[in-house]
Amino acid sequence: MSYYVIIRGPLGCGKSTLAERIAKTLKAKYVAIDRILDEHDLTKDKEAGYISQKSFKKANEIIAPKAARFLNKGTPVVFDGNFYWKSQIDDLIERLDFPHYVFTLKAPLDVCIERDSKRRKIHGKDAARAVYKKVTEFDYGAVIDVTKPLEESVRKILLYLPNLKFNKQNHFNLY
């Protein structure tokens, strides 16, 4: 069974780390929406101070056919992004007619700022605050508290997905 996963949340909440771990566990294709935006020069068009809905929909238009090829071959796809426009999520779901699971990651702003300050490419407090404000305007899908250890958050997400079972060591196996 083929499906895709959307991991959304504020800057610094651990989206990429979590999405990459989920993708590795599922042997899925990992897609970083920010990378698509950067590679196709889609970050300049602004709407209310944020990257525009139009830019995100263009990113969806670019990546959806590639994702569909993986999905048609039975390979799951994991999307990682802020997804701060609901229209962007709806557009991606409309473009990819496959089973899907959406997760909104939650962490307090101070946790996001602290995590951002510890990475190689720091975005800064102002960017973290701005993205946090926009992303937290709505929840979509299952809400996951990511203030817990990484493995606990991974486990919570995997419990929602098909074809997974625990082995005796409480690790997931694909079936």
Question: Residue locations for each model-derived region?
Answer:
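Glycine-rich phosphate-binding loop used to anchor ATP phosphates in small-molecule kinases
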Residues: 54-97, 101
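Walker A/P-loop
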Residues: 16
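Conserved phosphate-donor/acceptor-positioning beta-strand/loop module used by diverse small-molecule
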Residues: 96-115
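Small-molecule kinase domains that catalyze NTP-dependent phosphoryl transfer to phosphate-bearing small molecules
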Residues: 118-158, 163-175
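ATP-binding Walker
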Residues: 13
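Conserved substrate/cofactor phosphate-moiety recognition/catalytic segment
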Residues: 20-68
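P-loop (Walker A) phosphate-binding loop of NTP-binding proteins
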Residues: 10
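Hydrophobic anchor at the beta1->P-loop junction of P-loop NTPases
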Residues: 7
